[in-house]
Structure formats: structure tokens, C-alpha cells
């Protein structure tokens, strides 16, 4: 739903990231249909049109190492949205300010910490004005002291009404920000509930076992 934050949790190797990657056909589902905004997602002309509206933030940032921070953010709006260099730069600088990194515009990715790189990756995704943002374990590759700076940006986006699907092991984020929580194991969604119900009164025994080990 629009402005909803859906959090997907589960053990490692359970298929959480695969679900996320199927939402924009980075991986092709072996069966069934995925419908986004009333459009069935399939190979063809509509796939790229839908991908333009779906931003993705990866576990390991995936910034282009040969481009500056500013160039990383400007690239897609210019090549895909047809923005002028001036328009793309103005948008990129505004987004860098939003994530607290306007002083890093001319830096190269390898000059940044992991937390800073992930905030740049979020700004890059936002530069396309997506209708929904997908986050694939955005904090799992970060040092513990850098996790908060990324989660703070994500919480801010949620407060502003960004529609988000988040695969994460950050249970505090799921409780605080999520509107719905999905529990996935062995490629199957075993449980779906509000955060309050999910964490205080899970129904599925596998969910109970999982939560008992991590909380």
C-alpha cells in the first residue's frame, strides 16, 4: 500500500532477499505473478517503466567506484529520466544535504565509511523519485557504530510517507517503523502481522522459535 513500510524478517538463507529482488525482476520468479500498481510485472516494455518507479538499496552499497559521490547520484536521472546536468546536480546536492553528506559531494566512494556509502546509496535511489524503495539488509555490512546513521535516514523517509519494503535483522526498526511484518522461512511467508501483534503474540511456532533466539 502507498506510504506503508513492510518489513521482511527471517533466518539467513530463507529467501527474504530473493522476494525483494523478484519485485523488480532482478530475479525472475519460477511461478506466480507480481502486480505493482495494477500492472503485472513481466519481461517487456512495461518492465523498465516499472523499474524506474522502484528504487533499491543494496547490502553492499553498489556505488560506482570510478565516479564521485555527486556523479553516482546524477547518473540515472540524466540517463533514464532525461534530466539536464544542472537539474540533476541541484537534486543530488539537495539529497546529499538530506542525508547529511553535502560536504562529500566530490569524494570518491572509497574515501567514505560504510555508513556514509550507504547514505549515498539511499540518496542515489531517491534521485529517481521512486514510488517505492526496496532495502536489502542495508545495515548488515556496516560496523555496529555506523548502523544508527543509516537507520535514522530510513526512519526519516518513513515519517515523510515513503513506501518501503525492508529486509532487515534490525528488530528495533521493525517494531518502531514497520506497518506490517512478514516472517519468511524456506521461501515461504509463514506469518504476516502488525509489529505489535507479531512481536507480542506470534501465531506460527517457527516464528516463536525464531523470536525466542534473537530477542
Mark where each language-model region is.
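C-terminal boundary and immediately downstream tail of ABC-type ATPase nucleotide-binding domains
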Residues: 185-186, 190-192, 196-215
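ABC family nucleotide-binding domain
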Residues: 1-195
